[in-house]
Amino acid sequence: MTVATNPPRTKLALRAGGDFRFAVVADTHSKPHPASAQRLAELEPDAILHAGDIGDLAVLDELAKVAPVFAVRGNIDGPSDVPELRLIELTSADTLKLRILLVHIAVYGPKLRADVARVATKERASLVVCGHSHVPFIGRDRALSVFNPGSIGPRRFQLPIVLGAIDIRAGSARLRHIDCETGKPWTPPSVHVT
């Protein structure tokens, strides 16, 4: 599978103070968790990114009740007007502040797929937002930040049901996960090896 090139671009303006918040979701599979709408509303996002495996496109209409939605198709999604990948450009006074490549399948484990890294580099993105694995993840590879929000769809294996947030303040972006069931910050469990 090779990712398409020349993704559509969406330009968004930072708020007057230079702040912006994205809620980030993925892998809804037509059945977002019952608490997901409340959790998203609590975040008060400026926009919502959906990193694919939407399922029924009515899911996007429900998300749009909270904030404008920008989505990409996932591997379970059929043909539609939803693109395979998308560039999100945050600007302030016509100056680019952050460029995000939104794509469904981007990583193998903690490493970016070569085709995704090529597109992100060509498009000068600094952050790749993806879905597919249902595994919440924040990492870096090939000088790019990588963010998988996890899934707010049906539970898969023993994975948590989580969503993500990208908070832009004072020129920097903070990536975080929120437990959809409790509304509390989510961090990976600690493992102690003896």
Model-assigned labels for residue ranges:
Residues 75, 94, 106, 152, ...:
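Short, flexible active-site-adjacent loop segments at beta-strand->alpha-helix junctions, enriched
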Residues 24-27, 47-53, 69-75, 101-104, ...:
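Active-site neighborhood of phospho(di)ester-bond hydrolases with catalytic His/Asp-centered motifs
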Residues 70, 108-172, 176:
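Conserved beta-sheet core of the metallophosphoesterase superfamily
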Residues 29-30, 78-79, 109, 155, ...:
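Short, small-residue-enriched loops and turns at beta-alpha junctions
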Residues 28-42, 102-122:
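Pre-active-site segment of Zn-dependent metallo-hydrolases
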Residues 169-194:
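Charged phosphate-binding loop/patch that engages nucleotide di/tri-phosphates or the phosphate backbone
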Residues 1-69, 77-97, 159-161, 193-194:
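N-terminal active-site segment of His-dependent metallophosphoesterases
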Residues 34, 111-115, 158, 183-192:
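A short, polar/proline- and glycine-enriched secondary-structure boundary/capping micro-motif
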